[in-house]
């Protein structure tokens, strides 16, 4: 092969191929093709010079140092120009026109395009355009032939591209140094410029951020202030592919105003309803409010930069004006800094939502939240009550305008902020606070209180462990709360008070001594129960007896704290009944066996029992918590005593 100009190859390409021993990259081919396309543009020579010098330096300074070949920048360059293509076609809609023309004028080429891009036959023009744009966004290698056929790079694109690359080259160093969190889950060994322009971009976040940076005009507003406000608006607005064109026009209009007047002056003097159309209205109001309190800018930005908050800190203003105890909390420097410090300490931005040490196996934050009115937190999701599982749900709760936010606000005001100001460790403070209430558990349950459910949540960390996804079924009845192990319909389910009783007998030494030789477990289905079970030999016959405890009255309702009942029975091993008659026969057989055995083991309580339809023995009375503990103790210890006496005979 002749490596000379007559073959279309120059020394630069020869050096690249010879030095690396590899074929030209996708970007090198694209660059060569673009050089030819811009040859008739008035800036053709400037393009080539800047591409090989200033722009190359910019890509080099922003390359991904974590990639396999950090000495190469071809990937960064390809993604960058493809991202510009995406912005160009989303804004102008030219690709739609090309597709429509291709469909009408060149049907065979249109079918070839459908086949190449894997487009369904019935797809409309917008769906086709979206498919191609998505291919570009992921830097899926598109042959130059199709870039040409689809007119993806018309002259107008190159006009947009040269201005864009020049803007990024000019602003990149300053932009990279800005103390602004841009919504990333993980920040690798890369620059801000790389993360919003030189890798796969998202329609809802990095593409609008890139457009905001490209749109910046020097004048009345600094780059930092411009990108801070844009960051806050973009990260807190749900942006779809359909929304992006109008938002780009909104940014175009607003940046012109900000080049003539300071952005904060504009926000202070504007009606939030009349500016920044298309962005989240709640966030616009927040930006207008923050612009009035620039003296607190440093702590506010610190909070905005937390991954959990991501620019949205409206709850800070709400907290500083709330009166949970009737006393006004003023917006002042000390309060803003204290609340900011606590919020960042509690919500550190990890995937779990809240700081792990506050939500470990002690679940201190959750238990503390349940101590303040309205004695619950979270939100309703899919017919379940959700106590926040993961970052998104905690965010939703913290930013809610529902009354349940008062639990968090009150916890900060009454407990955490005072501790923070005194430099007391927040975890230790929560532990001491929760334990002070928890140690009064039994006494508190004796009081008449329609919100007594909270004490079970406060006292037992195990309640939170059981709800692995922090879901429960909770209607308006505070005495009917069913804990779920997962989100699905087939989830295990345990009634709250029944499960709390299980935890007492499973882990509390005072309760464990009452069930010596008895196993304790749960039945998390249907009418859930805590069961006690013992195997033994009595009068030379082997038995397995059980006591099922549940929180239901005789009408199968739960109306008060005193709704405990139990079944006492021998575990039988009947086959499935083949008829109603056989079912009744099995029940009668079981009943006679139960009466016969328990009359000998615990005769003193037999008057407290009645027959159930299935042959088991059921408590006649409904018990209080103390009452059920007492009768359980009498039954288990009575049975133990009878077995011991029988063994001695």
List PLM regions with ranges.
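Flexible coil/loop and intrinsically disordered segments
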Residues: 1-649
